[in-house]
Amino acid sequence: MVFYKYSGSGNDFLIVQSFKKKDFSNLAKQVCHRHEGFGADGLVVVLPSKDYDYEWDFYNSDGSKAGMCGNASRCVGLFAYQHAIASKNHVFLAGKREISICIEEPNIIESNLGNYKILDVIPALRCEKFFSSGSVLEHIPTFYLIDTGVPHLVGFVENKEGLNSLNTLELRALRHEFNANINIAFIENKETIFLQTYERGVEDFTLACGTGMAAVFIAARIFYNTPKKAALIPKSNESLELSLKNDGIFYKGAVRYIGMSVLGMRVFENGCF
């Protein structure tokens, strides 16, 4: 079985094609493992679709399924075009969400992540029990729970240096309390936002998270009156352009093809596929 590795703003993914829906959880855990596998943030299984150019099943590196992943959507869009599965402008199904892809340059991909939902506005009092004394999170007055395909908790710090002082244990506690990815951001100016994401399924900081950037972008737009277009800069320091239009959140940036490989017999013998 051939798989292809792509990277989008620091997130890397293994992409494979399958003509039948199966449970790929064990396969995802093995091939995504950084030391015992090939290493990736997630596995994308591209499947045929009657109503769309294709559909996907997305697996986090721990084998759990997710309905949506922003960076993976851009990576799979380029993969589908390069492998003649779809044209430059196409639509695929991610869980129950339609994702439109536009390839503007050889490696600049824009995806429409669709609409969002504000799930909750959470005062700091509901979160402070998770914070240690002197934590940078103590100074965040309000957190926002936003669904951009998957749920994200968003909070804004007062200065950029605060992003370098985040406590993994505190973010992990918030992740389990709200069953959401955790995003801490700093608005440098109205059009530039820095952020760090603690991602569930990865259970650590990731270099970037597309749906997380979308959630931060929306929270900044609604609650801090930032414009409808902004540059978001995640841990990878790669700038991504996000914009809000009538039909959804648009997310644009570079995608890199890294290489391809073949799954060896050991994977099949262990019953992963």
Curated annotation (Swiss-Prot):
Site keyed Could be important to modulate the pK values of the two catalytic cysteine residues: positions: 152, 199
BP GO terms, sorted: lysine biosynthetic process via diaminopimelate
Alphabetical list of SUPFAM superfamilies matching this protein: Diaminopimelate epimerase-like
Pathway the protein acts in: Amino-acid biosynthesis; L-lysine biosynthesis via DAP pathway; DL-2,6-diaminopimelate from LL-2,6-diaminopimelate: step 1/1
Keyword Plastid tagged: no
GO CC terms: cytosol
Top-tier EC class: isomerase
MF GO annotations: diaminopimelate epimerase activity
Catalytic machinery residues: 69 (proton donor), 209 (proton acceptor)
Binding site for substrate: 11, 60, 70-71, 181, 199-200, 210-211
Lineage top rank: taxon: Bacteria
Keywords annotated in UniProt: Amino-acid biosynthesis, Cytoplasm, Isomerase, Lysine biosynthesis
Enzymatic reactions: (2S,6S)-2,6-diaminopimelate = meso-2,6-diaminopimelate
Assembly with partners or alone: Homodimer.
Family, per entry: Belongs to the diaminopimelate epimerase family.
Record function comment: Catalyzes the stereoinversion of LL-2,6-diaminopimelate (L,L-DAP) to meso-diaminopimelate (meso-DAP), a precursor of L-lysine and an essential component of the bacterial peptidoglycan.
Protein name: Diaminopimelate epimerase
Organism whose genome encodes this protein: Helicobacter pylori (strain ATCC 700392 / 26695)
